[in-house]
């Protein structure tokens, strides 16, 4: 339940599953409107040979290998069937310049005899995630293509073999009126040629190949996407005119160009991590919409709290994803993310829980009423990290135009909110939801990010000549730090508290050992790396979780039951947490310890480099979603820390 291959151009995003089949098809936003996200929306691939059809996702004798071999977001899938003596090799991409998904299919006959092999390519959409059964599919004889459309979404499907189009097709219904889908029409090797359906529709193409012994043939297949049938057909025609080899070559060149800032650093990256370093950056880019949203994960197999997926833009995940890009000198992605946050900011200066890729408010399980306390359903750290990241970006690109665009209209209201969202009794930030989205309290983690955000805002105020705000925000940050020293360290246990709530003037302290408290205080400078509190917290954490160079995996916190593999363990390993520990180790010169963590994360990634949200400590299996943008970001950040230590 992961995506071994993801492909994207910031508008069309395709995720392939463990059978090499389309499982996610987002358009026109990365992470929003998944037209192939349902359980029965697999785009099946099959071969008809020796009198029977074999589907890649049904016949258990197919074996698969996945990789990104080209230093570009071009996936390679190899499917082999020993009994049928057939190999299917797919070179897949989403075109960098236009919204079309391309598959260059290499059909290899391993037999000692010449054979007729029929390749079936099937597609099923629920356009715009609609359950209204109002999609239409039609055969377009003048274009040698099939068209699926609903409203302002249109997909044109076609292909060729040696310059000739597919030789048969059919359009059908699935999931309604007793129909399973048009792919059932392929079981005798022949398609009926039904040319139109409306409702819940799917379609299938056939390519008939005569393949000599120990030889091969190629089939080109594509799905173009448009906001109208005219646009989708224009892209289809453009692809036919250019040829898919030219488009794949142009896409590879685009990715090489995009990777240029990272390639400049590559000589300094330890050889063992170079491939995953580059793959992580490309995978992160694949999760970024061209209008600024940074999606947590486009892997739709994971339903968060069993009701929703991770295909939203959390400002926190976006901030952490952009940190290594900012350090590498990227400009476009951070700028567009800040524009996205600017558009989504509440009039009171805070950011909400999460957003859809189109900028609308995302679903939430956080209430406005918390017992008798009324408070916005937010996580304060998400506002603070955007202020902090903007200051990091400005430090890399000190441009007066940046302040003109964002200082008065975004930084000032955000920093004012942070400075005033403070509990008068404790001096700490008021309660909000923690970064794990579970607990309403004042956490050490959120306090740390708020402190750093206010200091960052004060530094920006100096540059903007805004003396009054500079004094106010710096004072607020210093007061919060002093309150944290007073309240947030558990001297008895020798570790930071997870957080606290104040009831009738008395603190109710949460003593859970939460690794975000330790590493948040470290990353955002709330406590010095060599302070007594930090040193003792790391020692307590190391002992509590029995962490070592041979077992560097760490959970989020003790007794974390979220998707826990077994009640016998305290929680699943999270690469994010382990990599934070590696960053702490590098700060203290422990390169060996950091290397152990990097090896651990690399060894648990998929063959294409996908890093998941969690790892099962019992069988070392990746736990979806994969990829998780934040996991990849922390891997890249750790590598950059390692380079800086040198």
Indicate where each model-derived feature is located.
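Helix-terminus loop motifs that line ligand-binding clefts
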Residues: 66-71, 78, 291-305, 312-313, ...
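Polysaccharide-binding surfaces and accessory modules of carbohydrate-active proteins
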Residues: 78-80, 84-188, 203-205, 237-261
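C-terminal capping/lid segments that line or modulate ligand- or cofactor-binding pockets
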Residues: 1-46, 310, 321, 356-357, ...
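Short Pro-Gly-centered flexible turn/kink motifs
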Residues: 66, 115, 209-229
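An extended acidic
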Residues: 1-82, 155-184, 250-276
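Low-complexity, Ser/Thr/Pro/Gly-enriched N-terminal "stalk/linker" regions
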Residues: 1-9, 62, 163-164, 179-182, ...
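Active-site acid/base region of carbohydrate-active enzymes
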Residues: 165-179, 267-293, 339-364, 375, ...
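Extended ligand-binding clefts on enzyme/binding-domain cores
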Residues: 157-178, 268, 276, 349-356, ...
């Amino acid at each position: 339940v992961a995506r071994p291959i993801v492909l994207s151009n910031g508008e069309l995003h395709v995720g392939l599953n463990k059978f090499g089949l389309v499982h996610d098809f987002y358009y026109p936003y990365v992470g929003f409107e998944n037209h192939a996200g349902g359980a029965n929306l697999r785009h099946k691939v099959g071969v008809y040979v020796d009198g029977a059809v074999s589907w890649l996702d049904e016949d258990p004798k197919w074996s698969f290998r996945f990789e990104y071999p080209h230093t570009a977001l071009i996936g390679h899938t190899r499917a082999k069937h020993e009994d049928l003596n057939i190999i299917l090799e797919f070179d897949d991409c989403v075109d960098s310049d236009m919204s079309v998904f391309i598959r260059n299919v290499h059909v290899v006959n391993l037999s000692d005899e010449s054979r007729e092999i029929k390749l079936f390519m099937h597609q099923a959409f629920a356009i715009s995630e609609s359950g209204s059964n109002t999609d239409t599919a039609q055969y377009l004889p003048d274009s040698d293509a099939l068209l699926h459309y609903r409203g302002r979404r249109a997909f044109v499907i076609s292909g060729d073999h040696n310059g000739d189009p597919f030789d048969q097709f059919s359009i059908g219904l699935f999931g309604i009126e007793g129909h399973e889908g048009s792919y059932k029409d392929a079981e005798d090797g022949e398609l009926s040629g039904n040319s139109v359906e409306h409702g819940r529709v799917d379609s299938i193409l056939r390519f008939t190949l005569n393949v000599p012994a120990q030889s091969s043939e190629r089939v080109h297949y594509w799905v173009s996407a448009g906001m109208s049938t005219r646009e989708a057909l224009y892209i289809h025609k453009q692809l036919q005119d250019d040829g898919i080899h030219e488009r794949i070559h142009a896409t590879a060149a685009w990715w090489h160009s995009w990777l240029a800032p990272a390639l400049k650093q590559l000589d300094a990256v330890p050889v063992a991590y170079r491939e995953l370093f580059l793959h992580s950056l490309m995978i992160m880019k694949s999760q970024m919409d061209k209008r600024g949203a940074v999606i947590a994960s486009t892997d739709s197999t994971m339903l968060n709290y069993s009701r929703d997926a991770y295909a939203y833009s959390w400002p926190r995940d976006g901030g952490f994803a952009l940190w290594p890009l900012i350090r590498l000198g990227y400009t476009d992605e951070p700028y567009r993310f800040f524009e996205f946050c600017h558009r989504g900011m509440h009039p009171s200066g805070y950011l909400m829980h999460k957003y859809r890729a189109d900028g609308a408010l995302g679903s939430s399980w956080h209430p406005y009423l918390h017992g008798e306390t009324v408070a916005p359903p937010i996580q304060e750290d998400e506002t603070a990290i955007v202020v902090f990241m903007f200051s990091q970006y400005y430090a890399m690109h000190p441009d007066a135009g940046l302040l003109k665009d964002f200082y008065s209209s975004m930084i000032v209201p955000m920093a004012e909110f942070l400075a005033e969202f403070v509990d008068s009794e404790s001096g700490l930030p008021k309660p909000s939801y923690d970064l794990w989205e579970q607990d309403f309290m004042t956490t050490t983690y959120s306090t740390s990010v708020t402190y750093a955000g206010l200091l960052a805002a004060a530094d920006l105020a100096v540059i903007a000549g805004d003396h009054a705000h500079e004094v106010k925000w710096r004072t607020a940050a210093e007061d919060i730090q002093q309150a944290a020293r007073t309240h947030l360290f558990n001297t008895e246990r020798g570790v930071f508290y997870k957080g606290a709530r104040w009831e009738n003037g008395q603190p109710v302290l949460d003593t859970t050992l939460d690794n975000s408290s330790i590493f948040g205080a470290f990353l955002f400078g709330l406590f010095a790396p060599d302070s007594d509190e930090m040193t003792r917290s790391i020692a307590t954490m190391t002992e509590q979780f029995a962490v070592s160079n041979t077992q560097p995996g760490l959970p989020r916190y003790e007794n974390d039951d979220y998707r826990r593999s077994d009640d016998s363990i305290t929680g699943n390993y999270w690469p994010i947490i382990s990599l934070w520990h590696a960053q702490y180790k590098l700060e203290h010169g422990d390169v060996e310890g950091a290397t152990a963590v990097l090896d651990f994360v690399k060894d648990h990634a998929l063959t294409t480099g996908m890093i998941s949200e969690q790892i099962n400590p019992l069988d070392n299996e990746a736990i979806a979603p994969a990829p998780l943008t934040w996991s990849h970001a922390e891997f890249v950040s750790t590598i950059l820390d390692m380079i800086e230590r040198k």
